[in-house]
Each structure stands twice: as C-alpha cells, then as structure tokens.
Amino acid sequence: MAATHRLARGFTGRDHILTCGYHGWVNAMGGSGVPEAINSVYHALPWGNLSPFEAAFDELGSDNIAAVSVACSYADIELGHQFLPALRDLTERHGALLIFDEIVTGFRLARGGAQQYFDVTPDLAVFAKGMSNGVPLSAYLGRRDVMEKVRDVVISSTFGGDTLGLAAAQAVMAIYERENVIDTLWARGLRLHEGITAIAGRRAVPVGMAGLPPVGQIELPSAEARVALEGECLQRGVILYSVVYPNFSHTDADVDQALGVIDEALAAVQRRGLLD
C-alpha cells in the first residue's frame, strides 16, 4: 500500500492521503513513533459515510489530496454498493486518485476483488495473499498513465526479485482457470455462516455472523468472549480468528468439523458466563 501512496503523490504532486479501513503497516503512519510531518498528511476516515471525505476535501483543499485509499470493512461490506461509487465520483471531481486495498478481497470476494464485485474501477489497486496462496507476494497495478510515473518514483523491495512467490502465483492462476474457486469460497462461507448462526440460535447466545460468506466475521458481545472462544477452539484443534475465511482446500467435512468445535467452544464460553 505504501508504494501506491508514494506513486499517487508522485503522479498528482500532492501530499495528503485519506485512508479508510485496515492497510496493515500504513495504518501506523498516523500513530506513535511517526514524525508529526508524516502524521499530518494521513487522515483515517470511517467506512460507509461519504460526508467526512467531502469535509476533508473542503478543509484540506482539492489541490492537496493525492488519493483516497480504501480497504473494505468486512462486517458491513455491502455498504460498498453505494459508498464506493460515491468515492469514485468524489475523487474524479477533485482530481485525486482512488486506491483499493484488495489484499483480502482479491481472488476471494471475486477474482477481481471488490472492484469486480462492486463494479467500481479504482486508479490503483494492491493484490496479495490469495494470488499466491499465502506465499509472500504482492502486486500493485493501475491506470497506464499513473503506472508510468513509476519511472520517476523510487519504489524498492528487499525481496522484490524473489521468484518463489511468482511460481506460487503461476500455480494459483492455473487453478483459478481450471476450477470454480470463487463459487466454492462463497459456498463454504455460506455453510459456515448458516452453521454458526444455527448454533448460536440453539444455544440462545448473543453470537452472530456479519459480512459476506467469503469474508465473514463472528460477532461476540465482548473482547473477553472473543479471546475465550478463540482459545477454546484452539484447544480443540481449530484456529479461529475474528474473521472466518474459508479457503479452496477446505472440504465440507472440514467445515463440519469446524462447526462441531465452535459448538463445543461456545458451550464452554457460555459456562464461563461470558455470553450472558
């Protein structure tokens, strides 16, 4: 993501970046240990509400904002149907670039990520993770005129010449050509969503699923309950995180096993009084 931000600044000649969502290390650009000069040009704004972005353009001035950089909020991702086209229009009106963080959504929500699912084309995008089945690799891409600015912008990587990730990506692309990966991810995710929802209903606990099936998220009443659930699942052989992402290698039997473990884990958390 940092590469696209530098490229956007080089292309537009502007300094400020409006960010939305989780960009990994880039989120820390506005945090502790970062010089105020850098903090001052990153502005984190909420998902799904255009008003703060409009206000930022008014306050900072159109000539000062290089880009709006967006990662979808997975719990309420469907707001993207209205929010992302509105951001596309806003950035075009002000001459800023629109950047999509497709590190999670790419090759998962749709093969082309959020831009394909929501039918909104950004100026720049970043893909990783799914494109190489977890082997370290990332790629930034975009409009030809913007990408040509790479010649004038210093972007380097210690492992940029490594070929293992490229070989992994080549193998992954071949599987995407042969197999119906995306539909499988949606089907496995739906099975998880429906299963967890049914378990919570049967146990009468305040636990639910948010987001879309390929990028689902378990909602619990407290952070303590979440940590407890993850620990109970881990003890039973299932690694669970706040997000519940199926992958193509998971079978129906794997999903059933995970649901059985989640059922037992929720019962244990309930006995501890964390789901009252």
Language-model segments: what does each one mean?
Residues 55, 72-94:
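Active-site core of PLP-dependent enzymes with the aminotransferase class I/II
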Residues 172-197:
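Structural signature of PLP-dependent enzymes
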Residues 119-149, 161-168:
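Active-site PLP attachment segment
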Residues 1-67, 88:
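PLP-dependent aspartate aminotransferase-fold enzymes
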Residues 177-179, 235-276:
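PLP-dependent enzyme catalytic core of the Aspartate aminotransferase-like
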Residues 93-94, 203, 236:
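Helix C-cap/helix->beta junction micro-motif
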Residues 152-161, 177:
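A short glycine-threonine-serine/GTX helix/turn-capping micro-motif
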Residues 189-231:
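Conserved PLP-binding catalytic core of the aspartate aminotransferase-like
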